[in-house]
A protein has these predicted regions:
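Glycine-rich, proline-tolerant flexible connector loops at the mouths of alpha/beta enzymes
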Residues: 46-62, 104, 165-175
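C-terminal helical cap(s) of enzyme catalytic domains, especially alpha/beta-barrels
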Residues: 112-119, 124, 186, 209-235
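Structural preference for beta-strand elements that scaffold enzyme active sites
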Residues: 2-6, 46, 74-78, 98-101, ...
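Conserved, mostly hydrophobic/aromatic
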Residues: 8, 39, 47, 92, ...
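Glycine/small-residue-rich loop that forms an oxyanion/phosphate-binding "nest" at active or ligand-binding sites
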Residues: 53, 58-117
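Conserved anion-binding
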Residues: 12-15, 19-23, 97-171
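Alpha-helix-loop-beta-strand connector modules within alpha/beta enzyme cores
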Residues: 57-78, 114-129, 174-201
Length: 235
């Protein structure tokens, strides 16, 4: 199972949110590139990055920060937030971003996902974020009436091979991942599933690994020191 340390960006700086609430944003590190180098040193191959300003503005905002991390550290960057057009996707992939995460657009514009997967194949992932099992969009502000595994199946049907599943109620809380929902989505589709939200310590990593998931995203647990990243990578 791959470990994806997370860097969420507001105004060029690494921040964390509590349950996706922008009013709770607080800076957790001085510099994204410096933070990413720390992840590289711990043995990580990937970094999970989110353009939080982009999520709200519905367009790329902190592009240079992500490009710098990819170019300067050599880490593979998977990136989500505000990516809404083929031009956005093309721009990022041509500037060294390894994987693009399409979130809100997966529900609202599945044709774009289909087109992106056709052109970029495994470089496209879909982020499915759920509140009480129903998909939430637009920086988690809007809640839909679409059940999370139904969207996963729709995405699988258009060729998506990689899904990042977040239980919003666990995100940034250090209360443990939602194993039930992760098993449910993993059983519903043949896509690679990455768990996001709630990872607290090495026991959570071991539990996730036992569920045959593709990856786990770790954010707050790294910054708060409840998870040793090197230990997680080696687990």
């Amino acid at each position: 199972m791959l470990i994806f340390p997370a860097i969420d960006i507001i105004d060029g700086k690494p921040v964390r949110l509590f349950k996706g609430d922008f009013s709770t944003a607080h800076q957790v590190a001085g510099d994204a590139v410096e933070t990413a180098f720390g992840f590289l040193k711990a043995g990580c191959k990937w970094v999970h990055m989110v353009d939080l300003d982009g999520s709200l503005k519905k367009e790329p905002v902190n592009a240079q920060t992500f490009i710098n991390v990819a170019k300067e550290t050599g880490l593979r960057v998977e990136l989500g937030g505000g990516i809404r057009t083929m031009n956005d996707i093309d721009f990022y992939i041509n500037n060294g971003i390894s994987r693009i995460i399409l979130g809100s657009v997966a529900l609202k514009n599945p044709e774009l996902v289909k087109e992106a997967v056709k052109e970029f194949e495994s470089k496209i992932a879909v982020g499915i974020d759920a509140k009480s099992e129903y998909v939430a969009t637009e920086g988690w502000v809007e809640k839909s009436d679409v059940y999370f595994t139904n969207l996963a199946k729709r995405m699988e049907d258009v060729g998506v091979k990689n899904i990042i599943f977040t239980d919003i109620s666990r995100d940034g809380t250090l209360t443990g991942p939602n194993l039930e929902q992760l098993v449910e989505i993993n059983n519903a589709v043949s896509c690679d599933i990455t768990a996001s939200g709630g990872v607290t310590n090495i026991n959570d990593i071991r539990k996730l690994k036992s569920k045959n998931l593709y990856g786990a995203i770790c954010g707050k647990s790294i910054y708060e020191g409840t998870l040793d990243l090197k230990q997680a990578v080696e687990a």
